[in-house]
Amino acid sequence: MSARWTSAVLDPQITGGWAVARSPEGFLVDANGALFPRDWLKRQDLDVLAEHGIGHFDGEPVFLLELRSTAEVPGCGWRGLRSFMLEGDFDLYKVLGYAAQIGTWAREHRFCGSCGQPMTQIRWERAMYCQPCDLRSYPRISPSMIVLVTRGDEILLARSPRFVTGVYSTLAGFAEPGESAEDCLVREVREEVAVEVTNIQYVGSQCWPFPHSMMLGFHAEYAGGEIVMQPDEIEDARWFNVHDLPPLPAGRSIARYLIDLYVARRSGLPEPVLPR
């Protein structure tokens, strides 16, 4: 959270406030951004699946209108969440990232996973409830580790076939049941590039709402092994000198922060700050 944005469970029965609208194509925007007067937005011809009270931005209540489909609204368009992450007001991006996670979770938990009956929102906590099963479902968060492996002035970067052409990044992967973040790190590095690491240090974390990851950032030192790329997962992996790096991930991502932080420390430059 930030001084401007705090999440909260708000009753949609209350009036007023701001609202954001999310469709399969992203968030509704106009020349002023993605926040709209709630009363005005609810008067538009929108196919609303559900409404969620999600928190306060600059002291004002904020609600999410989760839509079944995209609609035409005069003077407005639709914009994907990633573009908000890359540029603009980062506090607003956090509002939209939270909204996206809540909208995705509630959409995917409309029916009980045990008995198949419809679930209802609990008004006093962020949960969906099945009365026949007495079962609560809470928002999903998927812990993932992301690590910069270093060897003196060299850093180990890789690229996936899914990356933007030419871009290299740090190694990352989801934690498995029963694993610590450190266990996950060692396993993922070994699986993806067949390298062993040591001196694992936690650096920081970042919410990654695509759709519901929590990125746990680490630095680790190379301990041994030759790079062997995991088929279908790693397109290329190699050591790069900190003074001769390839195209890198977006500046607001934790992947870029891990790289920039290490380069700054090796070069005696001011350390960057991780956007939170």
From Swiss-Prot:
It comes from the Bacteria. Gene3D superfamilies: 3.90.79.20, Nucleoside Triphosphate Pyrophosphohydrolase (3.90.79.10). The keyword NAD applies. One of its GO terms (biological process) is NADH metabolic process. Zn(2+) binds at C112, C115, C130, C133. Its cofactor is Mg(2+); Mn(2+); Zn(2+). The keyword RNA-binding does not apply. InterPro entries: NAD-cap_RNA_hydrolase_NudC (IPR050241), NADH_PPase-like_N (IPR015375), NudC-like_C (IPR049734), NUDIX_hydrolase-like_dom_sf (IPR015797), NUDIX_hydrolase_dom (IPR000086), RNA_Hydrolase_NudC (IPR022925), Znr_NADH_PPase (IPR015376). Signal peptide: none annotated. A motif (Nudix box) lies at residues 173-194. Homodimer. This is NAD-capped RNA hydrolase NudC. It comes from Pseudomonas putida (strain W619).
